[in-house]
């Protein structure tokens, strides 16, 4: 899969390295030329491009039309919205994933701005804390499809009813709306 990531900070770089390790074709765009050069030196196998991902010409030069996924992972919400909109509207990228830095801005990250999936690190951590405190064994990892679906982690305690502990997942009768992922 061809993935273009905008933002060479710690988040964007970590994602780029993980996806590269999984044999995806990854391009990492970083607007700070000096920092982009540093990334190239530190990670010689990583395709790093020194360019401003908010500029149409830079995205065109990075061949966004051939991207399967664009990840807007800069530290600036406004930049991430511009990148998402350009990726979806101007380059018809099938999947756009966007980082939300300030959870107060979450309402903006929707299909109108070209966002397919938004990830808010502050909201995710807050949710993990809230769920761990309130429920204990069910953790809401993230909302998907603009709140229509949730990715949750369920951990059964050793004191859970044997009917749950002694069955495989395929033997459990799960609601048709439930999907198990690993």
Regions found by a protein language model. Give the residues of each.
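Cytosolic regulatory regions of ion transport systems
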Residues: 1-182
């Amino acid at each position: 899969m061809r993935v273009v990531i905008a933002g060479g900070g710690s988040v964007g770089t970590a994602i780029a390295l993980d996806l590269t390790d999984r044999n995806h074709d990854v391009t990492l765009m970083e607007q700070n030329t000096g920092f982009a050069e540093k990334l190239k030196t530190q990670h010689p196998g990583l395709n790093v491009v020194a360019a401003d991902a908010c500029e149409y010409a830079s995205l065109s030069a990075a061949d966004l039309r051939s991207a399967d996924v664009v990840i807007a992972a800069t530290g600036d919400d406004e930049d991430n919205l511009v990148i998402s909109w350009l990726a979806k509207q101007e380059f018809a990228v099938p999947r756009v994933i966007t980082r939300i830095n300030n959870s107060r801005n979450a309402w903006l990250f929707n299909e109108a701005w070209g966002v397919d999936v938004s990830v808010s690190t502050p909201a995710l951590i807050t949710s993990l804390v809230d769920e761990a405190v309130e429920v204990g064994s069910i953790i809401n990892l993230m909302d998907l499809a603009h709140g229509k679906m949730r990715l949750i982690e369920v951990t059964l305690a050793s004191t859970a009813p044997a009917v749950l502990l002694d069955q495989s997942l395929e033997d459990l009768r799960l609601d048709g709306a439930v999907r198990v992922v690993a």
